[in-house]
Amino acid sequence: MAAAVLGQLGALWIHNLRSRGRLAWGVLPQSYVHTSASLDISRKWEKKNKIVYPPQLPGEPRRPAEIYHCRRQIKYSKDKMWYLAKLIRGMSIDQALAQLEFNDKKGAKIIKEVLLEAQDMAVRDHNVEFRSNLYIAESTSGRGQYLKRIRYHGRGRFGIMERVYCHYFVKLVEGPPPPPEPPKMAVAHAKEYIQQLRSRTIIHTL
């Protein structure tokens, strides 16, 4: 008796769903479907190429072109990639390619490929006249999506290891590279520290 009642209730529930509208996988929210790989990548870095600035006034200096490019899910450590990314930061595009050409690390070849792709993108999509008139304004690495795998041990035992991946991001700006900033001396650091102490305020007071 109870099974018959439950069967009738289930049939009524399905009938109500069908009367409201047919459900399809395409209209279900993405959170109900296992799409973790697609949800992790927001593509915010590449969207910066689509920023439209307001028109410039007559006589105003021309705004330099900015090119954002990246490569994701590189089979390489983010810490090893960071050292190479920091190496070319602030260099011209030709100088950076020359430095990476004579570096025997695996990440150097990857960064060189990304820089060449960004250089072609600058000429093709961003109206840059000279390929060499670019410098690396930003260059950094980020943590990718790690994958857990089984590491087999002796005597039938095992452990969990991670296959590491990283992202590499670069921003090219049209024009000559800016002069390097001189390193701060101890006196300058001390003055900044004293100024921070003097500018402190007492919270929850007038």
Curated annotation (Swiss-Prot):
Q: Which InterPro entries match?
A: Ribosomal_uL22 (IPR001063), Ribosomal_uL22_bac/org-type (IPR047867), Ribosomal_uL22_sf (IPR036394)
What is this protein identified as?
Large ribosomal subunit protein uL22m
Q: Which Gene3D superfamilies match?
A: Ribosomal protein L22/L17
The entry assigns this protein to a family as follows: Belongs to the universal ribosomal protein uL22 family.
Q: Where is the transit peptide?
A: 1-40
Annotated localization: Mitochondrion
**Gene Ontology biological process terms, A to Z:** translation
Q: What is the lineage of its organism?
A: Eukaryota, Metazoa, Chordata, Craniata, Vertebrata
* Record-linked PANTHER family: CHLOROPLAST 50S RIBOSOMAL PROTEIN L22-RELATED, LARGE RIBOSOMAL SUBUNIT PROTEIN UL22M
Q: Does the keyword Zinc-finger apply?
A: no
Molecular function (Gene Ontology), one example: structural constituent of ribosome
Sections of the chain in a coiled coil: none
Subunit structure, briefly?
Component of the mitochondrial ribosome large subunit (39S) which comprises a 16S rRNA and about 50 distinct proteins.
Chief localization: mitochondrion
Q: Identify the keywords attached in UniProt to this record, alphabetized.
A: Mitochondrion, Ribonucleoprotein, Ribosomal protein, Transit peptide
Any single GO CC term annotated in Swiss-Prot or TrEMBL for this entry: mitochondrial large ribosomal subunit
Please give the organism.
Answer: Pongo abelii (Sumatran orangutan)
